[in-house]
């Protein structure tokens, strides 16, 4: 029997796509989005679209009231996307597994960080003093 290279799919295995049922065994993350307090910072770390995606995957998002105002996102947009709107920066940090910011942590915000939290933000290495790094390592 002679096999031609273009005819090999006839003797090979054919695959069938199958949808897998996913169970919700993944960890639910609590994400805090504080308002940026720097005068020259108009960005926010997560848009309402990002909140919608995270919420749809079972994560809890806390956004500080007015956090998206300078970026032209309203609290209502965040709320409709699935975020809980909170009144204070301190409460944004409370019970959060992850804190996401654009600017580096302020000295006041560092006092609210708990040992088990992950901070995602810029560091601005060139403008930080030694005390910043000492506090962040605690």
Which stretches of residues belong to each language-model region?
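Structural/interface elements that position substrates and couple domains in central-metabolism enzymes
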Residues: 1-134
């Amino acid at each position: 029997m002679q096999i031609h290279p273009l005819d090999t799919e006839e003797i090979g295995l054919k695959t069938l796509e199958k949808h897998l049922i996913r169970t919700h065994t993944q960890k639910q993350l609590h994400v805090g989005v504080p308002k940026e307090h720097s005068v020259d910072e108009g960005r926010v770390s997560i848009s309402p679209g990002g909140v919608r995606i995270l919420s749809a995957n079972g994560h809890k998002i806390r956004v500080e009231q007015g956090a998206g105002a300078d970026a032209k996102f309203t609290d209502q947009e965040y709320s409709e996307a699935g975020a809980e709107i909170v009144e204070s920066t301190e409460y944004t940090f409370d019970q959060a597994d992850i804190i996401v910011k654009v600017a580096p942590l302020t000295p006041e915000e560092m006092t609210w960080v708990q040992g088990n939290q992950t901070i995602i933000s810029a560091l601005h290495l060139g403008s930080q003093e030694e005390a910043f790094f000492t506090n962040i390592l605690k």
